[in-house]
Amino acid sequence: MKPFMDADFLLQTDTAKTLYHEAAEKMPIFDYHNHLNPQEILEDRQMENLTRVWLGGDHYKWRAMRAMGFSEDLITGNADDYDKYLAFAETIENAIGNPLYHWTHLELQRYFGITTPLSRATAKELWDEANAKLQTKEFTVRNLILNQHVSHLCTTDDPADDLHCHLALQKEDFACRVLPSFRPDRAVHLEKPDFPEYVEKLAAAASRTIASAEDMVHALSCRLDFFLSAGCVVSDHSLEGCFYVPCTAAEANDVFENRMNGGALTEKELGMYKGFLLTNLGLLYHKHNIAMQLHIKALRNNSKRMFRALGADTGFDSMNDFAFAPMLGAFLNDMDEDDALPKTVLYSLNPGDNPMLASMAGNFAAPGIRSKVQFGTAWWFNDHKYGMESQLATLSSIGMLSTFIGMLTDSRSFLSFPRHEYFRRILCNQIGNWVENGEYPANLEFLKEMVENISYNNAVSYFL
């Protein structure tokens, strides 16, 4: 029997161990997509206890706790922090096969030096030990980031945000660069009830009137310029339905006007406006040499009762299953026709789309850019061991694994950075298996360089 999560965790061959310990393990982290709060980084917040640092916004954990039957009071409610923690400890003890189990114990090991498995029986011991360390200066938010050698992290930000935290952090002596990401979902999703209110908010931020779809593009262009001045290198879009129908500017303007006047819109009209906006944004991204991320197929807020109670992003989203390959190909081609397609990263929440996305990425290449269109890492419901193995196998079978930009956390927790380690171990194990099965030569120096590139260097080259 192998030891529990020891130094060679997930590394099944000698080649895998060599690649991880001599290459992947030492590399810094470029976390190009997360949902961390920049205000907490600026303030260098000190987390009060394990409950606050673990359960303060992590819907992965909330879903697992709900599956265990715990009351919402113990999850997102006003119950005592220790009682919430005990419920989480019991949840983790029961979470065999779930990535939460591995993530939680990697976090305990890497940040706190705790190797005891978390359970209801060990909860008090681990609570006391970890909380004592959380009160020291080594465990402020900034030190949690530096602990894992994070060189860059990209938060997720609305175009109307003032980015005061990012701008203030640029003036401070903090070794990690905290960069904003441009996420204009609220400008794109005109079917949302609060769209008219958001138009007013964005217009105020851009200091210009927004009375048409073309005005919206100009306002977003203005805000993108501001984001670029704050160090932005990447945009992000959530695409949840029909997102591209070719149309003229006049047609997009008509759809916008109809929406602002309270009219009902067809799915085609939604696709026309969204396609017009996304295409014009893509052209701007290409002009400014920033990457465009497309996160596709989240089916959000399925429990309307819980959405009314808790709001969005609280654990009631799942995978969608609509067909979108022709639409995606046409959207990317629209920009590529003018040789103005930006660097693009494709993700789908439904793993059934993996071969399609990997093959789609290969349609659009450019001299001097390695894998200009990337098949993105296993995302959200897929960032577990088997999901990552599947994504890596699909990418290597259809595309070029060596040019892959690697992992991200997509997390709201400052303890989430060991997810990069989790990915790197899985990567090294996959390559190690190929080598030891005689499917690739044991050229360890070349392979170590490849692993270093996938772990960090490729992302630096791609985004910077």
Enumerate the language-model features and the residues they cover.
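Short, basic/hydrophobic alpha-helical segments
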Residues: 331-337
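C-terminal amphipathic alpha-helical interaction region
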Residues: 292-294
